[in-house]
Amino acid sequence: MFPSSDFSFSPSSLFSAYASLTGFLMLFRSMLHDFVPEKLRSYFSSLLDRFFTPKSKYLTVIIDENFGLNRNQVFDAAEMYLRSKIGPETERLRVGKIPKQKHFTISIERGEEILDTFEESEVKWSYVQSENEKGDKVKRYYELTFEKKLRDKVLNSYLTHVVAESEEIKRNLRVVKLYSRDVYASDDDDGMAGGNWGCINLEHPSTFDTLAMDPNAKKKIIDDLERFLKRKEFYKRVGKAWKRGYLLYGPPGTGKSSLIAAMANYLKFDVFDLELSSIYDNGELKRVLLSTTNRSILVIEDIDCNAEVRDREAENQEDEQIKGKVTLSGILNFIDGLWSSFGDERIIVFTTNHKERLDPALLRPGRMDVHINMSYCTGLGFRTLVSNYLGLDGLNHPLCEEIEALVDSTEVTPAELAEELMQDDDTDVVLRGVISFVEKRKVERSKTKKEVSICKATDDDEKQNGSLGCVKKKKKGGKQKGKGKGKGKAKTYLI
């Protein structure tokens, strides 16, 4: 049906066909270069490339080290973020350390890749470092590769997540500083604070885990701090300065300073310790407070020792002794007045041993937001001390239950109990010593209260009878002149 063909594919015929085709292509190329403009040739070439090259489903974003003349914030955030994503599959790392750092800085070397997952979507990071032809400039950048369908999620949500995580990592690595106007600036000073503030590293070991406080009270403080950190937009919406005021009150040795250190270590906030006695007047107070930094805790200890805060009427006196001093109105102006809006993310802490001595204006809501009673140690607080100092669970030792009952019924401070727990290395000896100490303290407290009660009752009776009080002190000059018996009465003092 199909006649056979005499045509055969011999090597000579194939070579002849190849030569003819090659000659035609060379002639076509020559004509193309001679008669078709270069721009038109490039246009058709790009069309052919796009038509025949398969489209990739991946998109790559370049994150350069510099953005214009400034550092690229996204590059720095990615560098910090990827340090926490280094896994065992990474083959090459870079390690460095500067004198002020406590830990080594570890990052990936060029050519290394890191896979990351965000909301069930996978992305790939690559670190690239290249030099120019002269070798005097190094270009560093990250390549972020992901599927094109994830473009909006990565460029909006994921990169925002990377920046936020990097800020959190930096806060955790940051060394908390303690500022005071009595300390000279050191090499560790970052220069952020002015106003003659000097600083040292706050290496106080106190944390909320080591505080001898009721667990529920500690949880309330932590929850309040967390809410404060997350409410930037809330404070802005309600028209309030982004700050929080705490009043710590209670007898000495109950852990007020330790709580402040625990708050600073938890928040990674610097601490500015201000002594009002070192401030000349309200103008200097304003300058000093304006020189503090954001994300800091301003501490004014023993606020009850300042006469102007105890007695508001002292502001209205005109004598020279009062002039040139810090007044209560000057302090209140920085708590909730016009000057309270300076800075963001600030915490103000006042401490006092005698809350009742403070002017009521200082205690009103909106000025001191949280009042924390740092009272005597409780049984639960003693458990924390036993765990910290003896390294054991108080519930596992037979003497601890007896001590907890004694502590709950006695006025004894955590500092006093901590001192007793360091008296010996033997646990049984220490705990028996604590029992003896608490029992002795209980007897002393009971005796003191009884004496005060008797003295007060006696004084009340004698006052009603018009006679002397508990302790009598005669006026100088011996006998008093005059006929009346009431003249020259001794002054009465209560112990």
UniProtKB/Swiss-Prot annotation:
Residues 451-495 are annotated as: Disordered. ATP binds at G250, P251, P252, G253, T254, G255, K256, S257. It is an enzyme of class 3 (hydrolase). GO terms for biological process: response to stress. It catalyses: ATP + H2O = ADP + phosphate + H(+). It is a single-pass membrane protein. The chain crosses the membrane at residues 7-28. Residues 471-495 have a biased composition (Basic residues). Pfam families: AAA, AAA_assoc. It comes from the Eukaryota. It is found in: Membrane. Its cofactor is Mg(2+). SUPFAM superfamilies: P-loop containing nucleoside triphosphate hydrolases. Keywords: ATP-binding, Hydrolase, Magnesium, Membrane, Nucleotide-binding, Transmembrane, Transmembrane helix. Its main location: membrane. GO terms for cellular component: endoplasmic reticulum; membrane. GO terms for molecular function: ATP binding; ATP hydrolysis activity. Its EC number is 3.6.1.-. Belongs to the AAA ATPase family. BCS1 subfamily. This is AAA-ATPase At2g18193. It comes from Arabidopsis thaliana.
